[in-house]
């Protein structure tokens, strides 16, 4: 059994990797006309980041990298309650570290303004990429958080599927991001939303509640 300290370190590093690669594909690839790649490319970046992190660190920590996943596994009695809060704290710290590194890198581009770019933060209303309102954002985050956690639970409970579990999880994340990016800029991960919101501040912090509430409301349904 890997010690808790090492597992927390791995969860933090893995979360940082997923957030930096995924959000970096939006923030750092900025042209004069449009910020970031298209929905497909950004979704692929998040999915591949999860696949690589899961294969690299899964044997140590279980490769959650997402508070919603950790809570889902806890509710399903497949993760110890005593480790729940430490895991979530490690994931949030990893996401914040990734966001801080992204700010530092992005600031090297002339004309970069953190507030103006919205920094890949999640939002709804006027802060939705396609101006989707609160009810649309809530439904999308609820449904897709449920689907993603459910897939994670199901694929890891089947021994024969465990070798390909990172691929399935990555593909699932890619699919849910393809749907959610136009609506909320794609969350499905409260840690990812928190890291970006802390640096954007203002509206991003005001709307952060949705990206914690949506996955938490759906966790019970993902119990299998």
Name each model feature, range by range.
Residues 1-223:
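Membrane-interface helix-loop junctions and terminal tails of multi-pass membrane proteins
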């Amino acid at each position: 059994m890997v010690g808790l300290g090492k597992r927390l370190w791995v969860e933090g590093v893995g979360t940082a990797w997923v957030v930096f690669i995924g959000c970096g594909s939006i923030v750092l690839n900025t042209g004069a006309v449009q910020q970031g790649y298209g929905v497909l490319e950004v979704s692929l970046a998040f999915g591949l980041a999860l696949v690589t992190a899961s294969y690299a660190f899964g044997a140590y920590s279980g490769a959650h990298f997402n508070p919603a996943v950790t809570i889902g596994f806890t509710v399903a009695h497949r993760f110890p309650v005593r480790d729940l809060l430490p895991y979530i704290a490690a994931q949030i710290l990893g996401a914040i570290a990734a966001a801080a590194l992204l700010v530092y890198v992005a600031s090297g581009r002339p004309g970069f303004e953190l507030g103006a770019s919205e920094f890949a933060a999640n939002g709804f209303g006027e802060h939705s990429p396609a101006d989707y309102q609160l009810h649309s954002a809530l439904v999308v985050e609820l449904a897709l958080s449920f689907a993603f956690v459910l897939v994670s639970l199901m694929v890891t409970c089947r021994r024969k599927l465990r070798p390909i579990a990172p691929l399935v999880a990555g593909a699932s994340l890619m699919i849910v991001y393809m749907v959610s990016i136009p609506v909320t800029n794609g969350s499905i991960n409260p840690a990812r939303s928190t890291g970006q919101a802390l640096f954007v501040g203002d509206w991003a912090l005001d709307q952060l509640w949705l990206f914690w509430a949506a996955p938490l409301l759906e966790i019970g349904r993902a119990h299998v």
